[in-house]
Curated annotation (Swiss-Prot):
Region span, Disordered: 215-280
Subunit structure: Part of the 30S ribosomal subunit. Forms a tight complex with proteins S10 and S14.
UniProt function note: Binds the lower part of the 30S subunit head. Binds mRNA in the 70S ribosome, positioning it for translation.
Family per similarity comment: Belongs to the universal ribosomal protein uS3 family.
Organism, scientific name: Mycobacterium avium (strain 104)
Record's compositionally biased regions (Low complexity): 238-280
Domain KH type-2 positions: 38-106
Keyword set, alphabetical order: Ribonucleoprotein, Ribosomal protein, RNA-binding, rRNA-binding
HAMAP family documented for this protein: Ribosomal_uS3_B (MF_01309_B)
Name used for this protein in its record: Small ribosomal subunit protein uS3
GO process annotations (BP): translation
Amino acid sequence: MGQKINPHGFRLGITTDWKSRWYADKQYADYVKEDVAIRRLLSTGLERAGIADVEIERTRDRVRVDIHTARPGIVIGRRGTEADRIRADLEKLTGKQVQLNILEVRNPESQAQLVAQGVAEQLSNRVAFRRAMRKAIQSAMRQPNVKGIRVQCSGRLGGAEMSRSEFYREGRVPLHTLRADIDYGLYEAKTTFGRIGVKVWIYKGDVVGGKRELAAAAPAGAERPRRERPSGTRPRRSGASGTTATGTEAGRAAASADESTAAGQPAEAAPAAEPQSTES
């Protein structure tokens, strides 16, 4: 199940949040259709902006749109002309006042949507698909928050007559673990042979109690601190029974003799053992 379903929808309310936040009763279908139109409007005209995500939040008379982009300068435009144009188009589409927020993505190499878009752009420029996939994996694995990545391309790869799918993976990508923070991205490359779909899964660690687990501070090969032994000789063990040298009668007598000799007193003789009868 985890291998087929969309990782975002599979983990809603666990590690991921909804990208559209609003409540409606009778206008639910209209709002869903409007959200799809908003995302389509932003994706068609801003291909070069590197939009990673679009979040929509609604109130009674206002719509807030958050655009997460790797190139905010392209979205804003010169003196804000592009941002004003986008805001005007959204207000015309929704019929409400639109609050537009443009947020910059700090690490585009660790965003699955941007990685998929980068691979698709290389495929459109006639770059070999294996080379594009490996380059994307190498750049993503350099990021400290990326624990694993999987990149898959499907279509007429290399201009072949029959379509197929190939993927490369590095690190861990646990798709069926609900606490795993997995980012997913999909993009289509338009080539002369047809469209090639690019899918990217990026694993960024586990989320427990709403917080991402950090890597262990101590390295795996670090040695535990050794406890110092007290000075002096360690008592010897006699035989396989595991008793110490003072655990028998002869041992206790020898120990008392050593103590009395050290104190300057004559040592007491050990009691003689009673002879055992051998009568039959």
